Amino acid sequence: APVSKHAAFAYTTALNYLLEDNAHVKAIGDTTVVYWAESADPQYQDAFGCFIEGNVVTYYDLNAVMGALSRGKTVDWDGLPLKPDNRFYVLGLAPNAARISVRFFLRDTFGDYADHIGKHYERIRIVKPDYDKDENISLWKLLSETTNPKVSDKSASPQMAGDTMKAIFSGTRYPATLFQQTMMRIRAEKRVSRGRSAIIKAYLLKNSTNIDLKEDGTVALNESTNSVPYVLGRLFSILENIQDSASGASTVKDRYFNSACSTPATVFPLLLKLKNSHMKVMMRDKPGLAVSFDKQVTELIGRLPE
């Protein structure tokens, strides 16, 4: 649609002013995220920036701030008030040939943003290994889990990244491409990281209508569930540990991970037969560990239907 000279001057001047404020602009993938409060108070931008980064404050501090805002309470932020009913705007810009395109433009109260982002962090919360020092998984880190670490350009898919940001900020369903690209990297690398586990957990909790899947999506290992996919995943992990402890050679994960995911009824009987030969070695060299593994395998098999 035609735009008057005055309108063009007004919106370009305003946009340039916002983009010059580097402290309140985030580049995520190819998307530049600009955000501001209707009241023009900078503490809202400061807080929102921390919400996006995630790992700059502890989970509990972040959860306390966003939880209070989502319940309609005013929060103190470095001596300045954050009011939940203050209008807040988030603009996602992406390059498009010689122009700039709008990937998303969101308008909501600051309390609603806090609620949406806080629930996202709760969904991706998962037990982390000791070497991982990040309390939370930032948005940038989450998107990087969908990329190939061996290529020079490690940027996430632009459309997927934009759709994921929009879903998190607005509290809507995650894009299917986030789940699909995560699973593709897992199958290609045969490696499940904390971030990838968190993506799968969050996607199933938010998008799935399967009650069993929602119940299995816990922060730590759910030892009480009888969900067949969950139990098989635990069983596969133990079978891998058995082979690694017995021989130290390439594990079942290297050879059977993809087929175990696609045809478990065919692969698991074979893996259990292989387990028996490895257990003989362990009973000779590491009898205590062998007994422990055997009890775990027996307990998990007992959870599977006949």
Predicted segments with their positions:
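Extended alpha-helical scaffolding segments
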Residues: 1-306
